[in-house]
Amino acid sequence: MDFKAIAQQTAQEVLGYNRDTSGWKVVKTSKKITVSSKASRKFHGNLYRVEGIIPESPAKLSDFLYQTGDRITWDKSLQVYNMVHRIDSDTFICHTITQSFAVGSISPRDFIDLVYIKRYEGNMNIISSKSVDFPEYPPSSNYIRGYNHPCGFVCSPMEENPAYSKLVMFVQTEMRGKLSPSIIEKTMPSNLVNFILNAKDGIKAHRTPSRRGFHHNSHS
């Protein structure tokens, strides 16, 4: 399997979502974060778009989102986030296990995702992810194996203040199992808002002087 080609194609799809301005319906706004959705073309579910402002430069924000080491210290939606295969300095495969949601009505899922960071002109960075088959990590009876259709983060500088970033996140997750779509549609917008808030808190915590290894981890 040509993982690098898949990664590059996924980044291109995320860039396309970012340029697509038609058909989005706002489903939640909270604390200056906006969640919109439209029908996914990949599966019978929604593609979500989440927008917020992060008080950090795009370069530092994208490094923060790309690194694996500290992810579960701030991302409260995950219980496991491990790199399982490094392809090159910009591309790796990770195994994640989510927490349960909706007071336990959505049980934990696990995912095997191909993650890729691509840097564009104008200080815009895209971190894309897409589920792949990876024989070393077959589905387990302990968790339902979910599937992420092309997802990602787009980090770009704010025109009026380049030290701040506009973060746009795209999510289209196929939970699988026996969930009704209505449960997912009710819980997903709040979970996405919480992710942005958790990321803001995580970045704040990383601004303390004890940042040794921060950049090293993103390329280890």
UniProtKB/Swiss-Prot annotation:
GO function terms (MF aspect): lipid binding
Name of the molecule in the record: StAR-related lipid transfer protein 6
Role of this protein: May be involved in the intracellular transport of sterols or other lipids. May bind cholesterol or other sterols.
Boundaries of every START domain copy: 1-208
Keyword Transport: yes
One of the GO biological process terms: lipid transport
Keywords: Lipid transport, Lipid-binding, Transport
Keyword ATP-binding annotated: no
